[in-house]
């Protein structure tokens, strides 16, 4: 199984509007397009995204850049404060998927998949793209192949 995890691009500052409604900035859109270039030619089967506006915009930019035909799948289990265990429950039957989400979930999820605990989250900048590989999406059972920051 291969799994890609993408943090949304740079968004409007906190307080500009309610957190779920914060949009990408022009710089954030550029960051996302640079990260999307690393997914060209990858065997993606699905793109899952948080319902927050900035994650939806990020996922749509990636979809368009790749010419990815299937629709985006919007899920509530990719919001910022979701526990990584809940994400793993949803990935049991998945392969070659992209998750578009937020910190702290992105960093916690990457640490959990590698180490099996939450004590060592990864540091992921906006539009950072992580690639993991393993037999199954289990805590401590996946290897981080790298994190690309735009």
What are the residue ranges of the model-derived segments?
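Generic beta-sheet signal
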Residues: 3, 94-101
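Domain-level recognition of soluble alpha/beta enzyme cores
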Residues: 114-143, 149-150
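Glycine-rich phosphate-binding loop signature in dinucleotide/nucleotide-binding domains
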Residues: 41-43, 91-95
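Active-site catalytic microenvironments for nucleophilic, acid-base chemistry
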Residues: 38, 61-65, 93, 112-116, ...
């Amino acid at each position: 199984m291969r799994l890609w995890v993408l943090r949304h691009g740079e968004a409007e500052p906190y307080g500009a509007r309610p957190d779920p409604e914060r949009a990408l900035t022009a710089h954030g859109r550029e960051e996302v397009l640079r990260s999307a270039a690393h997914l060209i030619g990858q065997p993606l089967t699905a793109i899952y995204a948080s319902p927050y506006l900035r994650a939806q915009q990020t996922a749509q930019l990636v979809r368009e850049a790749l010419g990815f035909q299937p629709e985006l799948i919007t899920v509530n289990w990719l919001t910022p404060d979701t526990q990584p265990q809940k994400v793993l429950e949803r990935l049991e039957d998945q392969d070659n998927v992209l998750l578009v989400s937020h910190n702290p979930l992105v960093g916690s999820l990457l640490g959990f998949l590698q180490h099996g605990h939450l004590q060592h989250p990864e540091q992921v900048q906006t539009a950072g793209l992580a690639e993991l590989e393993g037999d199954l999406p289990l805590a401590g059972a996946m290897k981080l192949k790298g994190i690309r920051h735009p």
